[in-house]
């Protein structure tokens, strides 16, 4: 089968002929229709320090996808051949304390599809049936293929009550932009998103952000004054991993504010903890998606009218994968879809 593999311990990704994955008794065999390129895939493509420590070579990568069930393990119940599915990319152990308590997204033994095991940049993928999510008929393949990052946005945004609240999002990558759309959809008052990438900020405006602020040109505090905000942001969503962005968030949070952190800093990050203490801030770390509450909320948000389609800016056939990675790496894109049909 065709697959995109991290074939060598160097920058790049390669289109190869790979063996079809072998299915176990509790697994589904999925014929991939569309995949999306994630920021994690770009780290692997660029072969950065994290990738060098984490990714076995060679390995098929990728973890954002939609496909069709074409075979079912003999112990599987609840799925049938022809079901259209996406899937949770975090494979959990099922026996640690968090798994047994229903907090599977916090499993300490998590294995990542396309990170620790064969991924979805291939004509076929095998995953445990437990991890598969049936896609409703009224949700397109394009949207289903980005459910993984959309889930990060939903999990982060819905960590705290948003109705009537003022929200600051630092980092206008695709996940931050989708989080802005979620916040507006569920009833936040002002949703302000910051970045220095004007292309991405314009996407955020299209997706409903109240203000998309280029912090290299405009002061966040000036924007707050323009919006009539006198007390600070009630909710902060840190999506960038950039220390200066998080510092700006701490400076502008209201007393009693709540912060959800998804962005991963490149190294240790010092902050002024007195601001956290004296403002009484709550900080919550976010990893992945809640299984499977986030997935049902994703589908329901789209079915209730949330439109995240503007975040998808590029489509390529799999044979043109290099153009897709180039587009994603340029910073002048939203989500990039690769078609396997």
From Swiss-Prot:
Identify the metabolic or biological route this protein is part of.
Answer: Amino-acid degradation; L-threonine degradation via oxydo-reductase pathway; glycine from L-threonine: step 1/2
User: What remark does the entry make about the cofactor?
Assistant: Binds 2 Zn(2+) ions per subunit.
Gene3D superfamilies from the entry? Medium-chain alcohol dehydrogenases, catalytic domain, NAD(P)-binding Rossmann-like Domain
Record carries keyword Oxidoreductase: yes
Binding residues for Zn(2+) 1: 38, 63-64
Task: Give the required cofactors.
Answer: Zn(2+)
A GO BP entry: L-threonine catabolic process to glycine
User: Pfam families, from UniProt?
Assistant: ADH_N (PF08240), ADH_zinc_N (PF00107)
Say if the entry is tagged with keyword Protease: no
- Keywords of this protein's UniProt record, alphabetized? Cytoplasm, Metal-binding, NAD, Oxidoreductase, Zinc
Q: What is its EC number?
A: 1.1.1.103
Question: For the site Important for catalytic activity for the proton relay mechanism but does not participate directly in the coordination of zinc atom, which positions are given?
Answer: 148
Write out the catalytic residues in the record.
40, 43
Xref: PANTHER family? L-THREONINE 3-DEHYDROGENASE (PTHR43401:SF2)
- Free-text function comment from the UniProt entry: Catalyzes the NAD(+)-dependent oxidation of L-threonine to 2-amino-3-ketobutyrate.
Q: What is this protein called?
A: L-threonine 3-dehydrogenase
Recorded source organism is Shewanella baltica (strain OS155 / ATCC BAA-1091)
| Chain's gene name | tdh
